[in-house]
Amino acid sequence: MDNLAAIILAAGKGTRMKSGIVKVMHPLAGAPMVAWPVAVARQAGAGRIVAVVGHQAERLREHFSNDADITLAVQEEQLGTGHAVACAAGDLSGFSGKVLILCGDVPLIRTETLRAMVTAHEATGAVLTVLTARQENPHGYGRIIRGFDGRVIRIVEEKDATPDERSRTEVNAGIYCAEASFLFDAVKRIGNDNAQGEYYLTDIITMANDRGLRCTAHPVADPVEVMGINDRVQLAEAARHARRRIAEEHMLNGVTLVDPAATYIDQGVVIGADTTIQPGVQIAGGCRVGEGCTIEAGAIIKGSELGDRCVVESRAVIRGCRLGSDVVIKAGTVMEDSTVMDHAAIGPMAHLRPGSELGAHVKIGNFVETKKIVMGEGSKASHLTYLGDATIGRNVNVGCGTITCNYDGVNKHRTVIGDDVFVGSDVQFVAPVTIGSNTLIAAGTTVTRDVPADSLAIARTPQINKEGWKLRKRDQ
C-alpha cells in the first residue's frame, strides 16, 4: 500500500540477554527476532519500512541487504522511543499516509491485528491509535490513562506512575498507527523531563489532546501477541508460542503432528498435506517437504527439499539436500549437501558427504560413506564401503568393503566406473583409474590400472594351502 509505511524500533542493545549479539538478532523459530515484525508489516501492506538501528548496526545492515523495501536509520545514542522515531523521519520525508510503529523485540504480533488496528484508526478519524493489552501483571509496562469518553489522554511509564496509575491493567503494547503529518511534527517537540531523561514517544498523546485531536486505543485479544523479549527466558517462552502457532497452521493445512508441543518447525517451512511428523523432529532453514511423507522421531532436516511420499526414519540428519519422490532415508543416516533421486534407499547409518549425487533406485546401505560422487540409476553399495571422488555408472554392484583410494597424500584423484560393473567384496580402486562397462572386479582385488570393458580383473596373491601345518606346529 502506497499510503502505509512502517517504522521498526530495533536500536537497543539488550543488556539482559547477556550476549555479544544485539537482542533483535537473536533467532526465534528460524528467523532473527526483528525479522518477524518486518514480515508482519509487509503482510499488513506497508510499502516502505524503516528500521531504526543502533548497536551492531552493520549486523542488521547485512541481514537486510537484499530487502529493497527496507531503509536503515541509525540512532547513534539510544535516547528513547521518541528520539528513535525522529531518526526515521528523514527516510519518510514527503510521506503523507499512515505510519505503523512496531518494536523489533515484540515479534509475535499478528498481521490480522495490525490490519484491524489500521481499519479502526481510519474509521475513528484519529491521528494516533495505540495498541493496548490487558495484563494480569502489568509491571514494567506503560499504563493507559483514558478520559471520560474512552479516548486515550496519556500513557504513564512505570517509573513515572503513581500508585493509583500502577494499579491499572490496560497497558501500552508499544505498537502504534499514526498519521505521518502529525507524527513527524510531534516528535520534534518531545522533551525529556522525566525520570529516565529520555524522549518518550508516548508524550505525543498529550500533544494531540492539547490540540483537540483524537487518540484512540485498539485492544489486542491475545496478550501473547505483544509480549516483549528482554532476556533468554522470555525468548524461550516466545519461541514456544511461535512454534505452537506454526504447528497449528500446518495441522490446519492437512499435516499430522503426533505431538505438536514436541515438534520444532521453523517459520517459512513448507509441508505438504498428509505428511505425518512424529515427536522430536526438527525442520528448519526454509525446508520444503512434499505430500504424504513420514518423518520419524528425532529426525533433523535443515535447508532441504523432500519430494512426495519420502520416509525419513528415526535420528536421520539431512542438511542442504534435495530428495526426489519415494525416497527412504533409514535410521541414523547423515546427509549433507547431496542429491538423491526418486525411489532411492539410503542407510541405515550411512553418511552422504557434500557433493554426493545419487540416481533413481540407488541403494546405499549401512556404514557406507560417499563424497563427491555421481552414482547412476539402479546402482548399489550395500554395506561397509567408502566411495569418494568417483563417477559410477548405471546398475553397478559395489561389494562390501570396497574403497576408492582417492588421496595420494597431496592430491585427490577420481575413479570412473562404467555401467553394469560387478565389484566384488574387499576391492580397492587406487585412483586415478577407469573401469570399463560390463566388467567384473574379483573380490580382494587391488585395481591400480584401467580395466577395459567386458573384462575380468583379478589381482591377488595366489592362495597356498600347507597341509598338516597346524598339527606340525602343535607338536613342536
Curated annotation (Swiss-Prot):
- Pfam families, per database record: Hexapep, Hexapep_2, NTP_transferase
Q: Where does UDP-N-acetyl-alpha-D-glucosamine bind?
A: 9-12, 23, 75, 80-81, 142, 157, 172, 230, 353, 371, 386, 397
Report the pathway entry: Nucleotide-sugar biosynthesis; UDP-N-acetyl-alpha-D-glucosamine biosynthesis; N-acetyl-alpha-D-glucosamine 1-phosphate from alpha-D-glucosamine 6-phosphate (route II): step 2/2; Nucleotide-sugar biosynthesis; UDP-N-acetyl-alpha-D-glucosamine biosynthesis; UDP-N-acetyl-alpha-D-glucosamine from N-acetyl-alpha-D-glucosamine 1-phosphate: step 1/1; Bacterial outer membrane biogenesis; LPS lipid A biosynthesis
A GO CC annotation recorded here is:
membrane
Chief localization: cytoplasm
Give the start-end ranges of region N-acetyltransferase: 254-476
Q: Where does Mg(2+) bind?
A: D105, N230
Q: Please list the residues that make up the active site.
A: H383 (proton acceptor)
Instruction: Give the reactions, separated by semicolons, that this protein catalyses.
Output: alpha-D-glucosamine 1-phosphate + acetyl-CoA = N-acetyl-alpha-D-glucosamine 1-phosphate + CoA + H(+); N-acetyl-alpha-D-glucosamine 1-phosphate + UTP + H(+) = UDP-N-acetyl-alpha-D-glucosamine + diphosphate
In its UniProt record, a GO molecular function of this protein is: glucosamine-1-phosphate N-acetyltransferase activity
State its location(s).
Cytoplasm
What cofactors are annotated for this protein? Mg(2+)
What note does UniProt attach to the cofactor annotation?
Binds 1 Mg(2+) ion per subunit.
Q: Where is this region: Linker?
A: 233-253
Q: One biological process GO term for this chain?
A: lipid A biosynthetic process
**Leading EC class:** transferase
Q: Where do the segments described as Pyrophosphorylase lie?
A: 1-232
Its subunit composition reads:
Homotrimer.
**Family affiliation:** In the N-terminal section; belongs to the N-acetylglucosamine-1-phosphate uridyltransferase family. In the C-terminal section; belongs to the transferase hexapeptide repeat family.
Known role = Catalyzes the last two sequential reactions in the de novo biosynthetic pathway for UDP-N-acetylglucosamine (UDP-GlcNAc). The C-terminal domain catalyzes the transfer of acetyl group from acetyl coenzyme A to glucosamine-1-phosphate (GlcN-1-P) to produce N-acetylglucosamine-1-phosphate (GlcNAc-1-P), which is converted into UDP-GlcNAc by the transfer of uridine 5-monophosphate (from uridine 5-triphosphate), a reaction catalyzed by the N-terminal domain.
Spell out the protein name for this chain: Bifunctional protein GlmU
Whichever gene encodes this chain, its name is glmU
